[in-house]
């Protein structure tokens, strides 16, 4: 059920990669708990920074943390003060040397997590939920790499007594197609009526051959990339799309073309 499962987990190893990359034997549970604590630490107090995703990579004595953010200036701080504070807190949490990389997200309106966060902030500021959803969809569809988007809000929408879910969609969002590049984001809006969950799916086209073939094609020069050619099919004739030998007219034309020429035709 591609409509229910998390799109990232559904496509792991096919078109998406893990956001935590390390190997552990007996310390597996400890590392998972540590990763959750790192992500929670970076999420609290950094709402204005627009953090799209956090990637964690571990070696024997070092932890590398990549923060993808739409506003790197807020994460770095004045003269790097904020980045130094974050690094010291992470080193205190992990007990290892931390390499902190702050990467800028160029196209924030095409990132599902940032779109969901933007809609949630508008809901917290008492903006009508339908207006916030439509505005986010229009902004995302203006981006050249976005082929489709779906935005869903769940909770006491408009202060109603009974909670419900509503969604708007524009373009294609094939959630069950494994080769589809689906970006997914989730954020909660804190309102006076309670929490409202915002989910965003953004379709950015198909990745043919999976992430390994995509990486190989990007790395290879343009002349070395394999050409994709159309498969050969039998020629068709007639308005109904039938093959040349499946109708009486087609069979007659084929028989006439294959028959030997008569004496009169040769003399003419």
Swiss-Prot record:
Segments forming domain KH type-2: 38-106
Location of region: Disordered: 218-268
Pfam families (UniProt xref): KH_2, Ribosomal_S3_C
GO molecular function terms attached to this record: mRNA binding; rRNA binding; structural constituent of ribosome
Biased composition (Low complexity): 237-268
InterPro entries: KH_dom, KH_dom-like_a/b, KH_dom_type_2, KH_sf_prok-type, Ribosomal_S3_C_sf, Ribosomal_uS3_bac-typ, Ribosomal_uS3_C, Ribosomal_uS3_CS
GO BP annotations, alphabetical order: translation
Stored CDD domains: KH-II_30S_S3
A single GO cellular-component term on record: cytosolic small ribosomal subunit
Keyword set, alphabetical order: Ribonucleoprotein, Ribosomal protein, RNA-binding, rRNA-binding
This protein's record includes keyword 4Fe-4S: no
Annotated function: Binds the lower part of the 30S subunit head. Binds mRNA in the 70S ribosome, positioning it for translation.
Subunit details: Part of the 30S ribosomal subunit. Forms a tight complex with proteins S10 and S14.
Family: Belongs to the universal ribosomal protein uS3 family.
Protein name per UniProt: Small ribosomal subunit protein uS3
Name of the gene encoding the protein in the UniProt record: rpsC
């Amino acid at each position: 059920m591609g409509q229910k499962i998390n799109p990232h987990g559904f496509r792991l190893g096919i078109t998406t990669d893990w956001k935590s990359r390390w190997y552990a034997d007996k310390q597996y549970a400890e590392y998972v708990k540590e990763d959750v604590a790192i992500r929670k630490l970076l999420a609290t107090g950094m709402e204005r920074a627009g953090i799209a995703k956090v990637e964690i990579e571990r070696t024997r004595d070092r932890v590398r943390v990549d923060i993808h953010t739409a506003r790197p200036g807020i994460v770095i701080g004045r003269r790097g003060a904020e980045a130094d504070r974050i690094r010291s807190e992470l080193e205190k949490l992990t007990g290892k040397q931390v390499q902190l990389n702050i990467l800028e997200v160029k196209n924030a309106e095409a990132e599902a997590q940032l779109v969901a966060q933007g809609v949630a902030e508008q809901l917290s500021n008492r903006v009508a939920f339908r207006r916030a959803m439509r505005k986010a969809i229009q902004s995302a569809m203006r981006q050249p790499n976005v082929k489709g988007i779906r935005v869903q809000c769940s909770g006491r929408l408009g202060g109603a007594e009974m909670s419900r879910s509503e969604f708007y969609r524009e373009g294609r969002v094939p959630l069950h197609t494994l080769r589809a590049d689906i970006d997914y984001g989730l954020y909660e809006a804190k309102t006076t009526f309670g929490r409202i969950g915002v989910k965003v799916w953004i379709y950015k086209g198909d990745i043919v051959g999976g992430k390994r073939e995509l990486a190989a094609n990007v790395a290879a020069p343009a002349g070395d990339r394999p050409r994709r050619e159309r498969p050969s099919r039998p020629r068709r004739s007639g308005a109904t799309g039938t093959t040349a030998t499946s109708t009486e007219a087609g069979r007659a034309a084929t028989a006439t073309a294959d028959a030997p020429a008569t004496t009169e035709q040769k003399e003419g």
